[in-house]
């Protein structure tokens, strides 16, 4: 999405970031040339998918991963949902970094981490229960936990929209999923 490069010619199942070996034009680099601060927020390990090495090559200057979020834990109201840093904490981190850089335009690329697989028994107390006679117990648990994660993502989106609506700075929010869920397939 950030580079506009197609993955059609890459090996199936590969990690596209591993192919970013030199400076590569991207939407990020365009904003950087226009004077924007460029940053990424991802509440997971920096080595995953080679992000720490690849992001600077597409123009991202500031990288904030799980260790940064844990360090700001109290300030952000750190919570864990399932096995990951919650989407609510992810929203807090985005607000924190935007507020911290309110004196300049910012391009911030954020990737949440609360709702990836595995889904069975992910949340101790899911907010949503999905039952269907066609589902065995394992499938019902996976769908229930996935739906709870989607609900949390929806709350995160609403929180960010409300935050943006109350900012004194023009802000564009682009929200998308970067892959389909793996629900036992």
Describe every region a protein language model picked out:
Residues 1-185:
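Solvent-exposed soluble domains appended to multi-pass membrane proteins
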């Amino acid at each position: 999405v950030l580079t506009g490069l197609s993955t059609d010619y890459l090996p199936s199942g590969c990690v596209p970031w591993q192919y970013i070996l030199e400076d590569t034009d991207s939407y990020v680099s365009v904003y950087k040339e226009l004077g924007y601060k460029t940053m990424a927020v991802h509440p997971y390990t920096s080595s995953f998918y080679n992000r720490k090495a690849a992001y600077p090559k597409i123009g991202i200057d500031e990288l904030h991963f799980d260790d940064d979020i844990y360090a700001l834990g109290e300030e952000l109201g750190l919570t864990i949902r399932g096995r990951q840093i919650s989407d609510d904490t992810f929203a807090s981190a985005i607000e924190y970094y935007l507020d911290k850089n309110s004196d300049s335009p910012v391009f911030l690329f954020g990737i949440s981490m609360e709702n990836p697989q595995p889904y069975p028994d992910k949340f101790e107390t899911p907010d949503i229960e999905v039952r269907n006679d066609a589902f065995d117990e394992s499938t019902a648990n996976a769908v229930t936990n996935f739906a709870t994660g989607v609900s949390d993502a929806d709350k995160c989106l609403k929180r960010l929209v409300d935050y943006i609506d109350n900012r004194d700075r023009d802000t564009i929010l682009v929200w998308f999923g970067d892959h389909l869920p793996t629900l036992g397939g």
